């Protein structure tokens, strides 16, 4: 005798890996936060809506000190989704989970040293889990303008924008960035190497960065504004030339 059994959709658990920004504070922590505040002033929306992992392996913190540190980030609108390098015994629902097995993908140094003038380095990392498998290292083509508040991240290659990038928007690329319109937002290229370049048809950028070295709008020569330019890294300085 054959019995009919009602079939149900299977319950499946699937793994996913996602890119996340990793911040690694260094001592003295107060000075580190001062640098972070300066970065946020230059790029107010940089951390908005972006998950961040906090690496505390460089610090020796008690549980209460770690809670105070997390509060500092919360006060700045930075959402900490996980901890790395923390030794938390027991389970604390008020703490982000401790993450292990992350693979460093690249380093972007956020903070300029005292000797830097037009460019500097920032101390943060973009990290992905070991399970992430890049099928092909190709370019990402964006055929519409990038609006204010949008953030495009493509760490596997170049990013090509057919339109413009508005003020308050940002493009983060593992390779080069090509913008066939006005660049009024932030362009962060070279997450996977210093040979990357940034090209745009109309240069009005809030911030430029290649391999972690950056320049802000207040350091740009006035004669470059509104012109088609190419940006590249030479030594530890960003170079900008007009492309007529």
UniProtKB/Swiss-Prot annotation:
It comes from the Bacteria. Keywords: Cell cycle, Cell division, Septation. The keyword Cell division applies. Disulfide bonds: none annotated. One of its GO terms (biological process) is regulation of cell division. It holds the Pfam family MinC_C. The keyword Heme does not apply. HAMAP family: MinC (MF_00267). Belongs to the MinC family. Cell division inhibitor that blocks the formation of polar Z ring septums. Rapidly oscillates between the poles of the cell to destabilize FtsZ filaments that have formed before they mature into polar Z rings. Prevents FtsZ polymerization. Interacts with MinD and FtsZ. PANTHER family: SEPTUM SITE-DETERMINING PROTEIN MINC (PTHR34108:SF1). This is Probable septum site-determining protein MinC. It comes from Beijerinckia indica subsp. indica (strain ATCC 9039 / DSM 1715 / NCIMB 8712). The lineage of its organism: Bacteria, Pseudomonadati, Pseudomonadota, Alphaproteobacteria, Hyphomicrobiales. The gene is minC.
């Amino acid at each position: 005798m054959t019995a009919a059994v009602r079939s149900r959709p299977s319950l499946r658990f699937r793994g996913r890996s996602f890119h996340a920004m990793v911040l690694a504070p260094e001592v003295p922590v107060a000075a580190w936060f001062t640098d972070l505040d300066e970065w946020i002033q230059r790029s107010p929306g940089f951390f908005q809506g972006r998950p961040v992992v906090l690496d505390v392996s460089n610090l020796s913190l008690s549980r209460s000190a770690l809670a105070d540190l997390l509060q500092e980030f919360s006060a700045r609108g930075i959402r900490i989704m996980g901890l790395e390098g923390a030794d938390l015994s027991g389970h604390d629902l008020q703490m982000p989970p401790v993450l292990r097995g992350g693979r460093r993908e690249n380093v972007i140094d956020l903070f300029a040293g005292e000797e830097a003038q037009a460019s500097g380095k920032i101390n943060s990392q973009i990290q992905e889990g070991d399970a992430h498998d890049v099928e092909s290292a190709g370019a990402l083509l964006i055929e519409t303008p990038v609006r204010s508040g949008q953030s495009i991240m493509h760490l596997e290659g170049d990013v090509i924008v057919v339109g413009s990038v508005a003020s308050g928007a940002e493009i983060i690329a593992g390779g080069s960035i090509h913008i066939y319109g006005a660049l009024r937002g932030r362009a962060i290229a070279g997450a996977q190497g210093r040979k990357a370049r940034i090209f745009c048809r109309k240069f009005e950028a809030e911030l430029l960065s290649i391999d972690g070295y950056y320049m802000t709008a207040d350091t740009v020569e006035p004669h470059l504004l509104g012109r088609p330019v190419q940006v590249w890294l030479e030594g530890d300085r960003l170079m900008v030339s007009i492309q007529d």
